[in-house]
């Protein structure tokens, strides 16, 4: 009635509700709505540091079923969502991301007091450093191209966390589109032929990322000497495609 064509809802999966996403997905298809998924994470801003999927087999099994359903759909968006959900399985298993995190370059987060962070998933036990505060600069470009912002981007490149959230996954899925596409094409064909989708051999794509990123070490992030290069902004304020 309001003329909104792209509308939907999502489900953040924890230990107790993974089975719900299967019927919620089916309901979304019946209603002609979009359906998105996430898995719970820890963050200073989420006020949580003990979120952990403990019944991994059950949760991964339900994500597997969802992936197979998504690949049966006629929409390419659903096929790429299947890839995104494979990334959630990979995250739950505690592995480094399939594609690198480029938070602080492809996206950013402004907290209520004006500090700009690369994302909202930072934790003190790993690292948490601001790129600057919007109240202390005359323009956003001054902050975005500052040495402090570049320093934080360096910390992102060696960040121990293996988060897989839409805000940081979607931009790199688009940037390195050939890698998700290769998985999508292969597994869409398997789905059309009635073959099972394998989730045990999760691809990890080397696009030049630092091997330290996402290794879940709970220690100080190593500081590397960096050369500051001027760059064009690649800012994504919101992401609704997944």
Language model: regions and residue ranges:
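Radical SAM enzyme [4Fe-4S]-AdoMet core and its adjacent flexible, acidic
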Residues: 1-117, 121-132, 172, 176, ...
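Membrane-interface junctions of multi-pass transporters
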Residues: 122-170
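Residues that form generic nucleotide/phosphate-binding pockets
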Residues: 62-69, 142-143, 155, 162, ...
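Short cysteine/histidine-rich metal-coordination sites, predominantly Zn2+-binding motifs
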Residues: 176-187
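Short Fe-S-cluster ligation motifs
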Residues: 151-160, 188-218
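Hydrophobic alpha-helical context, especially transmembrane and signal-peptide helices
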Residues: 19, 137-138, 194-199
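Alpha-helix boundary/capping detector
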Residues: 54, 185, 189-190
């Amino acid at each position: 009635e309001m003329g909104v064509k792209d509308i939907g809802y999502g489900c953040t999966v924890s230990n107790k509700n993974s089975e719900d996403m299967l019927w919620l997905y089916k309901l979304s298809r019946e209603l002609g709505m979009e359906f998105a998924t996430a898995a719970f994470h820890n963050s200073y801003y989420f006020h949580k540091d003990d979120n952990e999927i403990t019944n991994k087999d059950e949760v991964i099994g339900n994500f597997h079923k969802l992936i197979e359903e998504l690949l049966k759909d006629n929409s390419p968006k659903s096929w790429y969502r299947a890839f995104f959900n494979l990334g959630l399985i990979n995250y739950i298993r505690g592995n480094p991301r399939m594609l690198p995190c480029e938070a602080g370059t492809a996206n950013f987060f402004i907290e209520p007091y004006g500090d700009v962070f690369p994302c909202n998933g930072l934790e003190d036990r790993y690292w948490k450093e601001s790129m600057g505060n919007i109240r202390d600069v005359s323009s956003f470009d001054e902050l975005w191209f500052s040495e402090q912002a570049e320093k934080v981007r360096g910390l992102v490149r060696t960040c121990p966390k293996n988060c897989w959230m839409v805000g940081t996954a979607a931009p790199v899925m688009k940037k390195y589109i050939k890698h998700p596409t290769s998985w999508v094409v292969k597994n869409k064909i398997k789905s059309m032929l009635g073959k099972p989708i394998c989730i045990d051999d999760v691809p990890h794509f080397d696009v030049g990322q630092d091997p330290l990123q996402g290794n879940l070490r709970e220690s100080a992030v190593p500081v590397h000497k960096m050369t500051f290069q001027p760059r064009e902004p690649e800012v994504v304020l919101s992401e609704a495609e997944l």
